[in-house]
């Protein structure tokens, strides 16, 4: 009986054990799926087990069960097969995802991949920009973007939908893409701006006239640019627009944009909470440099930004902002970054205030030691303090973002408090392959070793399960832990794989993981494992299985406060034998309030932290209550400067109350007294005999922080002086060192180089605050070549051209290259001429392109060859075997070489891409049999302005000005008899800031000059308002400065042969920087000259001025004065030229009234009047010598106290109290249309009592585009303008070869029969008159393609033939009747521009000049520079023998605006004389 019961009991026990084994498994359930192509994109739909996976062959797969089963998505029409290139999930709508196709067809799902709808967009998905931009409030609104990029320039085409792509509409074309203003659900939350912001779109668009990144603008539209195609430019800085917008981004409640001006690497970061009020982010004096900032994961109440500090070592500084994103506090120095801008930084998920950061321990030795020593640290108080990670008493260092080997977050997940990482203990972080897996279950306070070796890892079931897979080669097993990583178990896989990805649901609440790898055996088979841990526990956790866990602890181990509360979670205990098993239910934090403390407050608007961080100080004088502060000793109750951080939940009662009002002294609010006159400050130089011509402003660009006005200069004795306050105080940082030359960095306005006569040299990159010496490989050259050449994009790349063997008879020049600002040098070439970097934005792949002249076979008796190389001359290409000179200007490289058919003459060749050169075709009416010199005057983006010397007889030099087409090869005549001097400089100057206005002096008696010599030269000044197409005499004012008549009169506002205004030009200036106009004082010009038949001597000159771009002039002072503009024309200063004085005159109303100011107690001889090159300062500097003591002195004259406020600008097309919209015009056109459009500029009203305070004034808008007229065309090649304004073929010359385009492009289908006209590249006109394309014909052998393209058959053929015939007959009759049958014989009249006169003898179709060639003129002005004679100019080049210190390729409008009129600054290779050198010409050759 007992035996029987024992047997029964045993069987029952076995049965119970069997049931228990079935309920609780020891291993997860693993399901595998194989794929022929590698999965490369995988994502979950939030709160589901639905996964989308994209494979390399373009197929899309979906799984609805966490990856156990997969099916291919074919789409509604089956066209998704092998057509999907990328998957984008909607960040704010968990039901939507988008599959972007390789072509123009794409798909959307709105039900988590169950069904798909196709849509088409007329553009490919963008590759270098975000293809999809999502709306933060309305998930049906999406912007789709496509892009086309060439080098650094991109064209982005944006489209938009408001109904999830049921309909798609074009948005606009831009330079940097478009974004919704509401880029995140939290943006403008609580501001009641729903109606205003609902449809607002912001776009980064090109400058109105300059297609370069430094001119990009940020505009917005509230109706998708329907009512205004251009949009409204945003006032970002102090109520002013900003140019140079690089990027924009939505970061939770912040909208951020970055801007960079030309000439600096410093970025300006602007932040807004509503797109209306913007503030520049203040980094406490720290510079944010180009490509040097990374927006990191941010909170609802602050942004984290890492700023690059050392590009060579890739280290940065971590900053945290206040709640409005305007003031940033430095948290961590020397953060570890990679070259892509990724930063080793991560916030612990869902826990406020805990941050893991890696820093570089040996940051100051990285370059020398060639290896970073990275260490890890953690913060528990939102980055205010950091401490080491510890495993027991050992320091732990973990691999972070820059070396992450998985996807998603690096260390943490929504699993409360669980943190993992791969790393090592010791002094610093070792290689990833040498690391092991470590885990913490208290949010990083303590750590323990988990597994040996590197692993990929993931968290599941809110941390109940941790899974890991080896990341060291191939493996066939996984590891897992169900007790927070204390104990680990392993499970075998079906295949041995190389793991690529381990992931799970984004909220880490699932018990299913997904592992992707490739099989070791084949390498081409790819496996996706679904690993399900549901069976490892048989029960679901109950209340007693959870603990209340404090998320943050202070240094005493107590729960810590952040943002006014403590944070807790109910978390599963590590040893609980259960699973939470609540999929897609995120752990909810528990908040308990704290009393308010110091950490809960931040500085209020218009306050910043003091240096010790303990108080907030005002950034501007405070405004006291009415009736208070009658004297400085009074006090008043005012703001403390603190405010409670928005969103902070601390309890006021019993806590700190830092934001209560405090008693403040009135001395803090009384602003600096304003003055009714300027303030002068003199500095005497007792030991100097003379100022040299070498002085330069290191001007701050618009995106630069700081407000110093730095001037550097040399005395004639080689003493170097620096002033940081515009000459109020001077210092000698290199006292005792004799400096031979100053070479400002042409592309980086904070930098300059100082050269001596030997190998010692110095550089500064911080605006002359510090200098560092370096040793050049050889002394500066003695052949008049540029000593230094600079790279346009890499500020530390240099070419040094120096002298070799000059004491041994074989004196020649060698060129060396440095990529670290002279620390190391490598030989480029021996026996060289000029060498330059030729990298340009319009030349893709030209980053390392260098051009050099070199004597053939390294022998100076041979010809100079022109070579190029893209690998530092490891190999090179010979472009010309006998290149006399070459000049780089904008996008053009222009070469003067000997004519093979006439060795005494030159030919010009031009290249745009730096690879292919084409011979320049000069017009036949410029008959110069022997061409000895060309002066490159101007190249404004789309054309070259060239002076061809006709006569080089000393004292009687002159030539013809010709202009090119857009590729610089085909020229037409613009003006004859333009005067030049013996050095090749031409009396030619473009007006800065205005399109098409230029002034030139011509010789009116060429025949007499040729016979009698220079004594007979009679000069007249002419002006053009349409870029050289039509020239006219300057109209004189009616009265002189004393109100007396000039004795001659003008008719209809035109100058006449006997009565016009004449101005002394460039060739007569003492300082080439003294230009007529200013890039910031739009419309203003000044000059000295006389009224009469011809230009008289300087002794008879008076001072004249125009306010309307040269249309009307007035006499402002009798006698000769020097002038300068300040505050963009708000103040103008003049001082007598070269005669004793102690008084200057200034005007605050654009010259209507002039006030005297005595700047010195003793009379002085003033040599020079200067200010910052952009003419935006309110300080001026007089350079002179005291008459009695003969001492040199500078006098700073400060006008800033004359006005108290800044002018208020409205940037929506409206005028304001302080500004009006001004439109340039042609004096004889009524519609203000120039180059196919009407421009509008903001100009301050002369009566406004305020300052512009604007560093970069620019075109407000293109008011409108105009229809095309005759003025939008010029004569085609081999055609010349007739007296009546029409174009006719030059007798004896053939028409252009129209079929050439077919031969050059074998795929071309058609060509156009040539006409007498070609469209000006600069014009933006549309519709109207078409003169350049009349008859289209098929290319040879392309007749079928041509017919298909044009669809000529049946009825179409009838209309194609009949309509032109009827139209021609109608026009022919109309023209015959109106033109009296006199084709081509039209006189110029006064009724041009009216509709009745459209085809009349006065019609603009025929009266406008023919030779208009484009140039985007906001690129502004061009002054003649001479390659062979710059050493003789007074512009401050190095004179070591006959050398120039450097060459300066022309950049664009910004460089002109920043360095107006300075040949040294503008470019000595942009405006050059391309001629035969003295040493190279035969005895009968003349220069």
Curated annotation (Swiss-Prot):
Family to which this protein belongs: Belongs to the VPS10-related sortilin family.
SMART domains, per the entry: VPS10
Gene: vps10
InterPro entries xref list: Sialidase_sf (IPR036278), Sortilin_C (IPR031777), Sortilin_N (IPR031778), VPS10 (IPR006581), VPS10-sortilin (IPR050310), WD40/YVTN_repeat-like_dom_sf (IPR015943)
Glycosylation sites: 300, 324, 967, 1265
Compartmental location: Golgi apparatus, trans-Golgi network membrane; Prevacuolar compartment membrane
Signal peptide segment: 1-22
BNR repeat feature ranges: 61-71, 378-387, 438-448, 479-489, 721-731, 816-826, 1104-1114, 1145-1155
Main localization category: Golgi
Residue ranges of the TM segments: 1357-1377, 1410-1430
Lumenal side stretches: 23-1356, 1431-1487
Residue runs in coiled coils: none
Gene source species: Aspergillus fumigatus (strain ATCC MYA-4609 / CBS 101355 / FGSC A1100 / Af293) (Neosartorya fumigata)
GO biological process: Golgi to endosome transport; Golgi to vacuole transport; protein targeting to vacuole
Record keywords, A-Z: Glycoprotein, Golgi apparatus, Membrane, Protein transport, Receptor, Repeat, Signal, Transmembrane, Transmembrane helix, Transport
Job of this protein: Functions as a sorting receptor in the Golgi compartment required for the intracellular sorting and delivery of soluble vacuolar proteins, like carboxypeptidase Y (CPY) and proteinase A. Executes multiple rounds of sorting by cycling between the late Golgi and a prevacuolar endosome-like compartment.
Name of the molecule in the record: Vacuolar protein sorting/targeting protein 10
């Amino acid at each position: 009986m007992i035996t029987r019961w024992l047997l029964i009991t045993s069987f029952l026990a076995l049965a119970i054990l069997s049931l228990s084994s079935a309920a609780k498994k020891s291993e997860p359930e693993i399901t595998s799926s194989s794929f022929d192509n590698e999965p490369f994109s995988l994502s979950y739909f939030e709160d589901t087990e639905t996964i989308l996976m994209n494979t390399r062959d373009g197929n899309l797969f979906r799984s609805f069960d966490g990856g156990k089963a997969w099916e291919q998505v074919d789409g509604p029409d089956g066209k998704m097969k092998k057509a999907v290139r990328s998957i984008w999930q909607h960040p704010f709508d968990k039901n939507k995802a988008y599959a972007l196709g390789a072509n123009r067809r794409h798909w959307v799902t709105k039900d988590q991949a169950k069904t798909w709808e196709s849509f088409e967009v007329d553009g490919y998905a963008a590759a270098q920009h975000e293809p999809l931009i999502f709306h933060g409030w309305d998930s049906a609104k999406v912007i789709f973007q496509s892009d086309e990029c060439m080098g650094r320039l991109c064209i982005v085409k944006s489209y938009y939908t408001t109904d999830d792509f049921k309909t798609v509409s074009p948005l606009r074309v831009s330079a940097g893409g478009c974004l919704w203003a509401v880029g995140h659900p939290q943006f403008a939350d609580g501001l009641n701006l729903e109606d205003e912001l609902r449809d607002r779109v912001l776009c980064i668009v090109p400058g109105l006239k300059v297609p370069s990144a430094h001119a990009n603008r940020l505009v917005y539209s509230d109706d998708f640019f329907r009512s205004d195609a251009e949009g409204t430019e945003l006032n970002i800085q102090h109520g002013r627009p900003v140019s140079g917008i690089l990027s924009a981004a939505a970061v939770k409640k912040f909208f951020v944009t970055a801007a960079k001006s030309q000439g600096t690497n410093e970025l300006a970061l602007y932040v807004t909470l509503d797109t209306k009020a913007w503030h520049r982010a203040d980094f406490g004096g720290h510079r944010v440099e180009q490509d040097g900032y990374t927006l990191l994961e941010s909170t609802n109440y602050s942004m984290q930004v890492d700023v690059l500090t050392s590009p060579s070592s890739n280290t940065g500084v971590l900053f945290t902002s206040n709640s409005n994103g305007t003031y940033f506090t430095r948290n961590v120095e020397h953060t570890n970054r990679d070259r892509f801008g990724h930063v080793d930084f991560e916030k612990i998920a869902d826990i406020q205030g805990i941050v893991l950061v890696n820093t570089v321990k040996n940051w100051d030795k990285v370059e020398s030691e060639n290896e970073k020593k990275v260490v890890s640290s953690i913060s528990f108080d939102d980055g205010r303090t950091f401490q080491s990670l510890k495993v027991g008493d050992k320091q732990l260092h973990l691999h972070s973002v820059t070396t992450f080997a998985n996807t998603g977050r690096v260390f943490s997940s929504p699993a409360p408090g669980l943190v993992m990482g791969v790393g090592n203990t010791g002094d610093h972080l070792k290689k990833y392959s040498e690391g092991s897996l470590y885990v913490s279950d208290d949010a990083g306070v303590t750590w323990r070793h988990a597994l040996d070796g590197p692993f990929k890892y993931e968290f599941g079931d809110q941390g109940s399960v941790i899974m890991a897979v080896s990341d060291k080669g191939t493996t066939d097993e996984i590891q897992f832990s169900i007790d927070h990583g204390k104990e680990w178990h392993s499970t075998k896989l079906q295949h041995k794989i190389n793991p690529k990805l381990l992931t799970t649901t984004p909220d880490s609440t699932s018990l299913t993981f997904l592992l992707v790898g490739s099989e070791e055996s084949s390498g081409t088979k790819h496996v996706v494992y679904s690993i399900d841990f549901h069976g490892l526990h048989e029960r679901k956790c109950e209340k007693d299985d959870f603990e209340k866990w404090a998320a943050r602890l202070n240094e005493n181990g107590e729960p810590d406060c952040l943002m006014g509360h403590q944070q807790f979670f109910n978390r599963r205990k590590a040893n609980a034998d259960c699973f939470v098993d609540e999929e897609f239910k995120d752990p909810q934090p528990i908040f308990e309030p704290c009393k308010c403390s110091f950490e809960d407050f931040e500085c209020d608007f218009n306050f910043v932290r003091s240096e010790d961080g303990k108080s907030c100080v005002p950034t501007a004088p405070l405004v006291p209550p009415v009736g208070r502060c009658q004297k400085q000793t009074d006090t008043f109750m005012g703001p403390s400067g603190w405010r409670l951080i928005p969103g902070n939940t601390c309890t006021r009662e019993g806590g700190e109350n830092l934001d209560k009002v405090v008693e403040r002294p009135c001395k803090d609010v009384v602003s600096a007294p304003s003055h009714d006159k300027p303030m002068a400050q003199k500095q005497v130089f007792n030991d100097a005999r003379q100022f040299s011509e070498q002085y330069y402003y290191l001007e701050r660009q618009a995106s630069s922080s700081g407000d110093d006005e730095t001037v550097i200069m040399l005395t004639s004795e080689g003493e170097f002086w620096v002033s940081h306050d515009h000459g109020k105080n001077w210092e000698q940082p290199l006292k005792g060192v004799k400096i031979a030359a100053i070479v400002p960095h042409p592309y980086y306005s904070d930098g300059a180089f100082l050269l001596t006569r030997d190998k010692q040299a110095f550089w500064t990159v911080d605006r002359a605050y510090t200098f560092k010496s370096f040793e050049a490989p050889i002394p500066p050259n003695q052949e008049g070549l540029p000593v230094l050449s600079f790279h346009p994009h890499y500020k530390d790349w240099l070419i040094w051209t120096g002298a070799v063997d000059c004491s041994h008879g074989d004196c020649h020049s060698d060129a060396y290259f440095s990529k670290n600002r002279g620390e190391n040098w490598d030989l480029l070439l021996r026996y060289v001429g000029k060498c330059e970097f030729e990298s340009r934005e319009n030349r893709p792949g030209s980053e390392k392109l260098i051009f050099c002249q070199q004597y053939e076979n390294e022998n100076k008796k041979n010809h100079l060859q022109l070579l190029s190389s893209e690998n530092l001359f490891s190999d090179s290409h010979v472009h010309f075997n006998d290149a006399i000179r070459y000049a780089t200007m904008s996008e053009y490289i222009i070469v003067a070489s000997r004519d093979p058919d006439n060795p005494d003459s030159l030919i010009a060749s031009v290249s745009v891409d730096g690879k292919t050169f084409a011979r320049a075709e000069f017009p036949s009416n410029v008959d110069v049999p022997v061409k000895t010199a060309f002066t490159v005057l101007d190249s404004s983006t789309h054309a070259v302005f060239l002076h061809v010397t006709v006569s080089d007889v000393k004292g009687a030099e002159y030539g013809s000005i010709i202009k090119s087409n857009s590729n610089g090869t085909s020229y037409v005549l613009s003006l004859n008899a333009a005067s030049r001097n013996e050095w090749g400089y031409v009396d030619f100057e473009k007006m800065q800031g205005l399109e098409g206005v230029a002034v030139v002096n011509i010789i009116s008696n060429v025949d007499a000059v040729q016979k009698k010599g220079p004594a007979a030269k009679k000069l007249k000044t002419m002006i053009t308002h349409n870029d050289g197409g039509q020239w006219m005499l300057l109209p004189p004012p009616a009265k002189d400065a004393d109100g007396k008549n000039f004795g001659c009169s003008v008719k209809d506002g035109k100058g006449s042969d006997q009565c016009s205004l004449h101005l002394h030009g460039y060739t007569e200036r003492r300082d080439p920087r003294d230009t007529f106009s200013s890039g910031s004082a739009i419309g203003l010009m000044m000059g000295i000259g006389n009224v009469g038949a011809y230009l008289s001597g300087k002794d008879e000159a008076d001072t004249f001025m125009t306010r309307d771009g040269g249309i009307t002039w007035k006499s402002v002072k009798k006698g000769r004065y020097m002038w300068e503009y300040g505050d963009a024309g708000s103040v103008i200063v003049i001082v007598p030229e070269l005669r004793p004085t102690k008084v200057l005159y200034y005007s605050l109303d654009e010259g209507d009234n002039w006030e005297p100011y005595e700047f010195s107690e003793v009379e002085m001889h003033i040599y020079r009047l200067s200010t910052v090159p952009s003419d935006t300062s309110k300080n001026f500097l007089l350079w002179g010598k005291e008459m009695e003591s003969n001492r040199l002195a500078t006098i700073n004259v400060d006008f800033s106290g004359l006005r108290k406020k800044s002018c208020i600008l409205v940037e929506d097309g409206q005028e304001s109290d302080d500004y009006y919209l001004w439109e340039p015009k042609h004096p004889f056109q009524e519609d203000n249309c120039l180059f196919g459009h009407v421009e509008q500029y903001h100009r301050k009203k002369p009566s406004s009592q305020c300052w512009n305070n604007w560093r970069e004034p620019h075109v407000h808008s293109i008011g409108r585009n105009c229809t095309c007229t005759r003025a939008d065309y010029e004569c085609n090649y081999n055609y010349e303008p007739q007296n009546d304004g029409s174009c006719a073929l030059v007798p004896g010359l053939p028409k252009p070869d129209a079929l050439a385009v077919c031969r050059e492009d074998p795929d071309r289908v058609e060509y156009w029969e040539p006409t007498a006209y070609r469209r000006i590249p600069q014009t933006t006109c549309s519709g109207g008159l078409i003169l350049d394309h009349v008859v289209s014909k098929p290319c040879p052998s392309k007749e079928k393609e041509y017919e298909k393209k044009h669809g000529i058959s049946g009825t179409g053929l009838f209309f194609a033939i009949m309509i032109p015939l009827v139209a021609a007959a109608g026009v022919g009759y109309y023209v015959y009747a109106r033109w009296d049958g006199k084709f081509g014989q039209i006189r110029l009249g006064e009724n041009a521009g009216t509709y009745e006169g459209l085809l009349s003898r006065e019609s603009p179709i025929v009266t406008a000049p023919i030779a208009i060639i484009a140039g985007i003129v906001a690129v502004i002005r061009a002054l003649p520079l001479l390659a062979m004679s710059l050493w003789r100019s007074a512009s401050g080049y190095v004179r070591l023998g006959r050398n120039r210190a450097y060459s300066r390729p022309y950049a664009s409008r910004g460089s002109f605006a920043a360095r107006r009129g300075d040949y040294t600054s503008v470019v000595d290779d942009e405006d050059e004389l391309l001629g035969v050198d003295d040493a190279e010409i035969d005895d009968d050759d003349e220069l």
